[in-house]
Amino acid sequence: MPLSMLQRGESGVVKSIHGKPKDIHHLADLGLVVGATVKAVNEVAGNLIIEVKGSRLAMNKVMANRIILEV
């Protein structure tokens, strides 16, 4: 399921990331890679706040739709 559908407090494991290579590389620099566990923390102004590898990140829903999780 896409990361954008994760509800607050739920977690999932990244199975695939779709998008431009530069975007995928940027996400990898932030710790968001295949196999990483992601937790939905909050939603603010249409952006998702997620926690990955101990850090919190804000992400718009367009990008969150490109990240596929196994819940």
Regions found by a protein language model. Name each.
Residues 1-71:
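Compact, glycine-rich, soluble single-domain proteins
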